[in-house]
Amino acid sequence: MRVSRLMLVTLRDVPADAEIPSHQLLVRGGYIRRIGSGIYAYLPMMWKVLRKINAIVRAELNHLGALETLLPQLQPADLWERSGRWQGYTEGEGIMFHLEDRQNRQLGLGPTHEEVITELAGDLLRSYRQLPVTLYQIQTKFRDEIRPRFGLMRGREFIMKDAYSFHANQEDLENTYQAMATAYARIFERCGLEAVAVDADSGAIGGAASQEYMVTAAAGEDLILTSSDGLYAANQEKATSRPPVALPLAAGEERMIETPDQSSIEQLCAANGLDPTQTVKVLVLLARLDDGREQPTLVSLRGDQDLNEVKLANAVSRSLNAAVLEIRPISENQLCQQDLSEFPFGAIGPDLSDTALKGCRSWENHFLRLADATALDLPRFVCGANSKDQHCWGRTWDAMPAQIKADLRTARAGDQCVHDPSQTLSECRGIEVGHIFQLGRKYSEALDARFTNSAGQQEALLMGCYGIGISRLAQAAVEQHHDEAGISWPLGIAPFQVIVVIAKIQDPTQVALAEELYQSFLDAGIDALLDDRDERAGVKFKDADLIGIPWRIVVGRDAGEGKVEVVERSTRCSTSVPHQEAFQQVKDSISTHL
């Protein structure tokens, strides 16, 4: 390919709407262009990158015996209603684009395809003799993001590989899950990415076990907690740790204390000589559920701990056997709307009476009471007395209403590791590029996808699902491989492997040697780009650095002697060598790395 025919338009200035380096560089380098909020066009070089990633993914999945398919992007609402996810995806998270056709039938644009693939499996997989089987597709997905940002990292339209496996028994599911994990490691390695597998929450997809694959990068939206021995890594949403040891509360009888202007734990401790580990704070929240219920919820945490909202949503869902659409703090305005008296915010205790909800209009008339283990493990503590400007010193759990024990706290860097208290957790940021799940029978039970087992009995299929964000992975590679001059693509996914730059297009000697080198690369099956533009050499060099081709061959003033300059993009090291040696150096490098 010649640059003069590539439709390459580069930018020197940083786009105003590009917040992170990878987004800035992909726009500046002529890889993507914004069409609308969260909607991008993949320009020719970006499409080459995506096709190379797709080829790597296909090779690894085909090696596992997976079968490629293509599923419809338009999905009937009926399937999602049967799985119980329609309301959550259209009202709760609200991430599914949905529409009504001319026959007034509800449809959704697929953000994922569990329902569709399960419906097909139930129709096609009738016997255990057909199992196991894994199907995958690579196609565009849609998410109605509240706040699209960071270019391809969080867009409203994106390319994804999603695979689904079906099994007759748990052992077989676990074997495929592990095989897929191994394949993912190879995929990310071949794409030139440093990725770490971490324990993760299953989220709206569901299932018993799941792992995320994170590309470590400062711009990552996720916080990863890891142990130094490499035995533990988890997304903070899922992570567990040993909390600091609580200081015992001084002996003494239970008593009321006046606490004016002490609505926070910090104020309470400062005014009364307390340590936060000696206190229990209570959050008053309202959970909105997919079955229509609105459940007032009291959450008790030790005073030094922070609430993990993902763990909370899971605990509420388990306790009430319903999916959580949203959980938010109860406000005074909401109390007025429910015809309820004002709550003593800032002084609420775990034993706030259900009578506080008496007469409410639409909420459940009792509290769901959840307590983190750090709070329940305190023998005596200070907490709100359910009266304005008053707290109770020396409370115990004995006289409290029953609490549902749950892990609700947020693990943090510096906490002791559960598996080895001598180690502490460290943190880094990551970009999620893949996620694998053991779904079990969640969807097959809901959609009645059954097979006949070896005993001749009907049984629901066991399932796994496995996703890779193709377009996100491409941008994550840039986030991990760039410098102040531009992108430095890993060799395996670079749009071109080498760029031959003619320093002075008016020099026939330079042009002839460059054309010879360019043709030699093409004849050797090497993806080469020839910069044949009538531009100053400095402009060409800047563009070459910006677009990030792994190898650059500059044909310049030494062309008459058959010499060229070889520049490796990742190191910026350059050498002047005979053109035959330059060709062989690039060829050998590509053969070694691919």
Curated annotation (Swiss-Prot):
Q: What one GO molecular function would you report for this record? A: ATP binding
User: Is Cytoplasm included in the keywords of this UniProt record?
Assistant: yes
Question: What is this enzyme's EC?
Answer: 6.1.1.15
Q: Where in the cell is it found?
A: Cytoplasm
The chemistry this enzyme catalyses reads: tRNA(Pro) + L-proline + ATP = L-prolyl-tRNA(Pro) + AMP + diphosphate
| GO BP terms in the entry | prolyl-tRNA aminoacylation
Spell out the InterPro entries in the cross-references.
aa-tRNA-synt_IIb, aa-tRNA-synth_II, aa-tRNA-synth_II/BPL/LPL, Anticodon-bd, Anticodon-bd_dom_sf, Pro-tRNA-ligase_IIa, Pro-tRNA-synth_IIa_bac-type, Pro-tRNA-Synthase_IIa_type1
Print the keywords alphabetically. Answer: Aminoacyl-tRNA synthetase, ATP-binding, Cytoplasm, Ligase, Nucleotide-binding, Protein biosynthesis
Any Pfam family hit: tRNA-synt_2b
Record's GO cellular component terms? cytosol
Free-text note regarding domains: Consists of three domains: the N-terminal catalytic domain, the editing domain and the C-terminal anticodon-binding domain.
The family this protein is said to belong to: Belongs to the class-II aminoacyl-tRNA synthetase family. ProS type 1 subfamily.
Describe the task this protein carries out.
Catalyzes the attachment of proline to tRNA(Pro) in a two-step reaction: proline is first activated by ATP to form Pro-AMP and then transferred to the acceptor end of tRNA(Pro). As ProRS can inadvertently accommodate and process non-cognate amino acids such as alanine and cysteine, to avoid such errors it has two additional distinct editing activities against alanine. One activity is designated as 'pretransfer' editing and involves the tRNA(Pro)-independent hydrolysis of activated Ala-AMP.
Q: Tell me how this protein assembles.
A: Homodimer.
Q: What's this protein's name?
A: Proline--tRNA ligase
Q: Which organism is it from?
A: Synechococcus sp. (strain WH7803)
